Amino acid sequence: MAVSEVPLVFVVGTGRCGTHTMWRVFESLPNTLSTHEGAGIVHAGPPSSLGKRLSMGCMPEFNAYLYHYAGEDIFRRTFEPDAEMTTLMDRCFAIRSSSIAWCRTNGIAYCDANAFGFNFINYLHTKFPSAKFIHLVRDGYACVRSWSRRDASTYPERLPAPGGISWLLAKPAPFPSEVVHGSWAHFDRLQRISWFWNTVNANIAERFDRIPVANKRVLKIEEVTQETIPGILNFCGLPQEFKPDSLAPDDPSAGPAIEWTPENERKFNALAAPMMEKLGYALR
């Protein structure tokens, strides 16, 4: 396989949307390096590399900088990175760039499923014009309920464990120009996660507007089946020999979940209706 033909695939989403599943599907393919939030195992390439574990990190620090220090003006620069922003993003992405270079040298496809990588989309399209991007989505009610179980790192109502702070800070907070900014301090946890689901999906959708149709796809995790996987792999330019058991349920959330009472549905709909409708999910 020529260097220019090596597939590069980036899967982005809110988290709890199926990135773990897509990582496992890609990992089951021959001649492919698949990572989930920076972690993976080398299954192809020189014998000396086989079995090597990668731990590149999920890059939460860049999101934490944008949302909790830099401000909206700097955040907007990531949509069309200038030279200074590109230099910063190059440094943040350096370890992955090295892995991609290794894959290209060895003729191996590179697949990156990362729920923290959405702010790199436009940078990556400029850096790798042939790369394919998948916006992986999940029904908002199911996704928010799943996130509600992750109370240590997702807008917790109590003090987090030290290990969860970087994950917590990677979650966005409203910029002053946003309508909900003045209400944020009074939002309960359900409202914050609902806003998060809508905001991250809207962010990705706006970034996708700047990417050619041939390089992008919006994919509902509910529609990822043995029957649809071949078409997904064809879009990505990847081998078709996936293992069906890679679709088995995995990485479930644990802990108590919110209940969809009429009041909670009202709160969710007030914040997340725009993206529910845009993505083709029915409101309750």
Which residues fall in each region the model found?
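PAPS-dependent sulfotransferase catalytic core
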Residues: 1-94, 244-249
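A short acidic, amphipathic alpha-helical/loop segment
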Residues: 21, 120-127, 231
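Anion-recognition interface
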Residues: 61-101, 108-124, 156-193, 226, ...
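Acidic-histidine catalytic/liganding microenvironments
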Residues: 29, 128, 211
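Hydrophobic/aromatic beta-strand patches that form the interior of the parallel beta-sheet core
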Residues: 9, 33, 129-134, 217-219
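Short aromatic-enriched loop/helix-cap "lid" or pocket-rim segments at secondary-structure transitions
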Residues: 45-50, 124, 145-150, 155-156, ...
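PAPS-dependent sulfotransferases, especially Golgi type II membrane carbohydrate sulfotransferases
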Residues: 1-9, 156, 171-284
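Conserved phosphate-donor/acceptor-positioning beta-strand/loop module used by diverse small-molecule
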Residues: 113-115, 124-149, 222
